[in-house]
Amino acid sequence: MAKNKSQYDSTLNLPKTLFEMRAGLPKKEPVMLKDWDDNDLYNQLMKHNEGKPQFILHDGPPYANGNIHMGTALNKIIKDIIIRDKNMEGFQAPYVPGFDTHGLPIELKALSSVGDKKKDISKLELRQICEKFATEHIDIMSDQFKRLGVIGDFEHPYLTLKPEFEARQIEIFGEMAKKGYIYKGLKPVYWCPDCRTALAEAEIEYGEDDCDSIFVRFHVSQDPNGVLAKHGIPMDKTYFVIWTTTTWTLPANEAICLNGQFEYSFVKIGDEFHIMATELVKSVMDACHIENYEIVGEPVPGTEFELMRYNHVDLPKEGWVILGDHVTLESGSGCVHTAGGHGVDDFNVCQKYPQVPITVPVDDGGYLTELAGKYAGQRVWAANKTILADLTESGAVMGQVHIKHQYPHCWRCHHPIIFRATEQWFCSIAKFREDVYKAIDTVTWMPDWGHDRMKGMVRDRNDWCISRQRTWGVPIPAFYCKKCGTYHITDATIKAVSDLFRKEGSDAWYKYEAEQIIPAGEVCEKCGASEWTKDTDIMDVWFDSGSTHAAVLEERPELRFPADMYMEGGDQFRGWFQSSLLTSVASKGCAPYKSVLCHGWVVDEQGKQMHKSAGNGVEPSEIIKDYGADIIRLWVASSDYTVDVRAGKNIFKQLSEAYRKIRNTARFILGNLDGFDPNTDCVADDQLQEIDRWALAALDDLMVNTSAGYAVYDFNKVYHAVYNFCVVAMSNFYLDVTKDRLYCTNGAGRKAAQTTMYKILVALDKIIAPILCFTSQEIWDFMPKTEGMNQYVVFEEMPKAGQYAADEAFKAKWAQLIAVRDEVKKVLEQARAEKVIGASLEAAVTLYCNDTLYSLLNSIPMDELADLMIVSHVELVKGEGGAASAVEGLGVAAAHATGEKCERCWKYSSSIGSHAAHPTLCARCASVVEA
C-alpha cells in the first residue's frame, strides 16, 4: 500500500497470491490441456452428469482437408460455450465431434499426390490414398480444436467414411427410394467442367464475370399457320430476335420460346422484319443502337406464332417456336433462346414439345462436340468469342455490349460452371415439399428470420441432384440390367449393400463384381433377366452429412434423435441444415432438430472478407501464440455472432486489455483471501456491512443478466455483464472502498469483506467458466475450497439468481449513496486542483442535506460512510451549504482533514500518538498492531 517503506508494512494485510498478474496463457493452457487429457475430463464430466436431462447439440461435420481458420474457431467455440454451460445448468450435454471425409477436394489432393501415376492407379487404390489423407487431417484438426479448449469425445468422433456410417447412409437412400423419392433421369444440372462432375445448389457460389450480351436474329423458315401472310409480312425477310449472355449455348439451340400471354410486333428495319415483344421494342432498339425502325401493323398474340420454324444461325438445322410461362418482360426481347440441354426452364418447356430434341453438344470437360459443327474441340469459354465473331460477320448479331454480371462458380475449384443435361440421380423434393414446410414450422429458428429463409429456399429449389461422377464417396447402390439397361433398387439389394458396407466399408463396391453383391434370385422387373452391372457414380457429400441424424444421432447410445440443436454458419441453410432436413423428413417425416442456431461470417477489421491474396486474414494459431486461446474465446463471447464478426490484431489486442481487467479482479480477490478458510471463516449474513450486502446484490443482478444471456445463447450479453461488474461494480467501487477494511483490520469487518469477496469470486468464476475455460480453471485451482467443491469448475452448477437479491428500496438507497459519492469525488477533484488536498484520504467532507437525505446518510455508520467516500472524515449537516450538486438536497464541502496522518492506514486522525508505543499510529491501528 505504501510507496515508502514503513516499519508497519509487515502488519498490513496486503494482498498475497501466487495467481499471476501476467496471464501467460500460451504456456499455461497446454499444461491444463494435458491435465484434462490425463484425467479424462470429458468422460468424467459425462459420468458426473449421468441421469440428468440430456441436451444434444449435434456437430455439423467440418471438411477434413486442412487447418482450421477463424470461422472454424468461431463455430467450435460457440458450440463449446453452449456445451459447457448446459453441463453446468443441470443437463448432461455430450459433444461428439464429426468430420466430413468424402468428396472432391480430398480426391483432387490424392490425385495430385501421385503425379503422373494417376492414370495408372485403380479406383480402389485412389480411395485408399483419399482415406489416408482424410484420416491425417482429422488428427490435425482435432488437436487444433482441443487447443481452443473445446471439450468433447475426440477419441471417438463420427466420421462419414466409417463402415457403420456408410451402411446407415445406404439405408436412408433405400428408405427414400422405397417411397418413390429417388429417381434417375436426364436433366440439366450444375456442371463443373474442371472437376468433371455434377454439383448441387449448395456447392455453387456466385462471382462477378465479364460476358457479351448479344441480340441475335434467326430467319423464319416455315409458317404453317400462315401468320405472316395474314399480316402481309414476307417470310423470306422475317426474323425472330433473341437475347443471350451465353453465346456458347447457341449450337444447342433447338427452339425459341415466346409467352402466349404477351403481344408481339413486327419491327421493320430497312426492308427486313423482326419479331419481338411489343413492350420491349424500344429497349431492344436502344440496346442495339438502332434509331430508324418502324412497327408495322397491329400487335399479334404470342400464341399465333406457335410451331413456326426457323433456320439455325450457324448450323444446318431448323428450330421450333414454342410457348412458355417462364418468358418475362424484365429484359431481352420476349423471344427466349431455348437450349433444353443447358437450362432448367429450357428443359422443362421442351418436355411439353416431343418434337423438340434435347441437344447437349458439350462433353464432361466443357469442350464442344461434333454436334456443334465447326466449333467441335473448342472449350465453351473460348467458343464464346469464335461464335460471336462468326455471327457478327454473317449479320446475325443485331447488337452487342460487354457487361459484368454475377455468374455461378464451383465452390471447390472456384471456376465458372455450366448447365448441362446429363443422366443423374435425383431426390424428388416436389413429392414431399409440403411435409418439409410443416417440419420447418416445428423448429425454433435463431435468429427467427431463419424460418422464412429456409422455407423460401425449399420452396424455390429444384429436385436435388445427388449423384457425382467421381470416386471418393459412398457409391450409389444401384444395379443395371445388362440386357435392357433398367436400373434395379429393391429392399433386398439395399440390405445386401448395407450389410456389406457395414462389414467391409464402401471400398467393397469396387472390390466385387455386381453378381457377388446382389442377392441371388433378383431379376429385372422389366425384362426378367438376371445379369447385372453396378452404378459408377457416388453420392453428393451433402447426402453424407445429411444422413448424420440417422448414422450418428440414432446410432450413438449417448445421443438421441431429434437433436436439441444444430448450430452452424448461415451458408448451411442451403447446406447441412437443408440436406439434413430433407433426408430426415423424407425418411422419418420430421425435422432432425428442435432448434437451429446460425452465426455469421468472420471478416477483417474493416468488414471485408478475408483472403490470403489480400493479406487481411488472421489465423487462430497466431492469436494463440501471442495471447492464448482464452482471448479467442473472449472474442467469440464479446461479438454479436448473429451477424458478420470482425477479427484482426487490433481487436485481439483490445480484448486482451479487457481480459486483463477481468483477470485482475479475480487476482485482487484471491490476494485478499490469503489465509481465509471458507469452512471456518465465513461470517453470517447479519454480520455483513451494508456495502457488502450491496455487492452481493450486484452479484445477484449479474446472475440474472448472465443467466438470461446464456439461456438465449447471447454470450455478448454475458460478456458485457461480467466486464461491467468487474470494472464498475468491483474495481471502481466495492474493492476500492473495502481496501482499508481488508488491509488495516483483523476483526469481523475484514472477515465480512472476505466472506463477501469469496462468494463473489466463486459465483463469478462459474459464470465465466463456459467462456474463459482455461482462466476460470486457473482461478478455481487457487481458490480456497469448501467441502463438496469439485476439482474442475466445469463440474460445478451455475449459480442461481435470487439468493442475494435485494428489494427495490435497498437498491434505491444505494443508487442514491453512489450518486452522493460521485458528487463528493467531483468536489475532491476541485480541492485537489486547488492544492487543498493531495490524496483523497487527506480530505474531510461535510455533506449538507435536506431531511430525507440526512436520514438516508445517517443510517450508515460514519466510519463506513467515510470509507465509502475514501476520505478521513465525514460530517453530516442538516440544511444548505457547500457546493451545489446534481443530487437533490445535497451540498458538498471539502477541506483538509484535521489531525495527523497515520503511518499505517494513511487516514488523518486526532488520535495519532494516543498509544505511547506507537506514536505515529491512530488508535485503531495501534490496537490492531498490539493485538
Q: Where are the regions that the model predicts?
A:
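Residue patterns forming the tRNA-binding/recognition surfaces of aminoacyl-tRNA synthetases
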Residues: 2-25, 31, 35-39, 111-251, ...
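Acidic, turn-prone loop/beta-hairpin segments
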Residues: 100, 189, 193, 199-207, ...
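Residues immediately within or flanking Cys/His clusters that coordinate Zn2+
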Residues: 189, 407, 478, 521, ...
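Cys/His-coordinated zinc-binding microdomains
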Residues: 196, 469, 485, 528-529, ...
